[in-house]
Amino acid sequence: MESLPGQIDKSLDEASLSLRAGSLRTITHILLPLLRPAILSALIYSFVRAITTVSAIVFLVTPDTRVATAYILNRVEDGEYGVAIAYGSILIVVMLAIIFIFDWLIGESRTSRSKAKNQA
């Protein structure tokens, strides 16, 4: 995500300045729509990373709380592979659903940009 702002064509910023648009308007109408896919990708990466991390969650829950990934590992250790596979499959489906929602949102931004380009 660090390199994306450097990839945005400087002529967009110059055009905004020549049209006397303020900094806030330039950010909200030019930069943020272009950065939206990168921001959503970073959110997806962070979400997947957070879901799969057990150690950080240990500090946030009580001893009675069951974390899905820890529960799956306990089922494997106890030899209950069927239960572990079922819970793992559910976890994968939930994560994929959230990723597809983010992908759909990114697709919407691509579609709206191409529509705007065709109208111009």
From Swiss-Prot:
Alphabetical list of Gene3D superfamilies matching this protein: MetI-like
CC annotations in GO: plasma membrane
Primary localization class, coarse: membrane
One of the GO biological process terms: transmembrane transport
Function, as annotated: A severely truncated paralog of the AfuB uptake protein, homologous only to the last 20% of the intact protein in Actinobacillus.
Family: Belongs to the binding-protein-dependent transport system permease family. FbpB subfamily.
Protein's recorded name: Putative ferric transport system permease-like protein AfuB
